[in-house]
Amino acid sequence: MSRIGKKPVKIPAGVEVNIEGNTVTVKGPKGKLTRQFPAEITISREGEELQVSRPSDAKPHRALHGLSRALLQNMVDGVTRGFEKGLELVGVGYRAAKQGNKLVLSVGYSHPVEMVPGEGLEIEVPAPNKVIVKGIDKEAVGALAAKIRDVRPPEPYKGKGIKYEGEYIRRKVGKTGAKGGKK
């Protein structure tokens, strides 16, 4: 059995779980999430725990087993604690600002780049060179953070760009002075 899949998902106090066929709805203090799970996977409630099971030991079923359990755990964590992803802007004149619910990035282009967060997502700008994406859906938080990073990914020579908090940028040595050539 999958080591991750066989662990039960604990339902904390204040969280309501509704299972209808292969659709699971989780309601908590921060919001509500609904997800459709593969038909092969069975999700059952046993007291204050959710158990995920699979029909056979076939490789696709084993993969779906662990995945489904992890997605279910992320739903429960999202509606109780929420998720956040931090980004840092590195570079002279690179800065972020919030206008209404839009994020405006000045990252060396001839124009500022505007981004609108999706539903259920929130963007904070605690400092001009720092952006925090918050939400209850881990997948959506990560996707928006990746989209912001893709506006100006970090480059390996000077390390300028938008990077995740704590991300290590592998640096390269630049070209050395002119050597030889025609006279």
Swiss-Prot record:
Gene Ontology terms: biological process: cytoplasmic translation
RNA-binding keyword on record: yes
Disulfide bond residue pairs: none
What GO molecular function terms would the record report? rRNA binding; structural constituent of ribosome
Does Ribonucleoprotein appear among the keywords?
Answer: yes
Keywords, comma-separated and alphabetical: Ribonucleoprotein, Ribosomal protein, RNA-binding, rRNA-binding
GO cellular component terms listed in the entry, alphabetical order? cytosolic large ribosomal subunit
Q: How does it assemble?
A: Part of the 50S ribosomal subunit.
- PANTHER family, per database record: 60S/50S RIBOSOMAL PROTEIN L6/L9 (PTHR11655), LARGE RIBOSOMAL SUBUNIT PROTEIN UL6M (PTHR11655:SF14)
Q: Which family does it belong to?
A: Belongs to the universal ribosomal protein uL6 family.
Functional description taken from the UniProt entry: This protein binds to the 23S rRNA, and is important in its secondary structure. It is located near the subunit interface in the base of the L7/L12 stalk, and near the tRNA binding site of the peptidyltransferase center.
* Name of the protein described by the UniProt record: Large ribosomal subunit protein uL6
Q: Which organism is it from?
A: Moorella thermoacetica (strain ATCC 39073 / JCM 9320)
Taxonomy of the source species: Bacteria, Bacillati, Bacillota, Clostridia, Moorellales
Gene name of the encoded protein: rplF
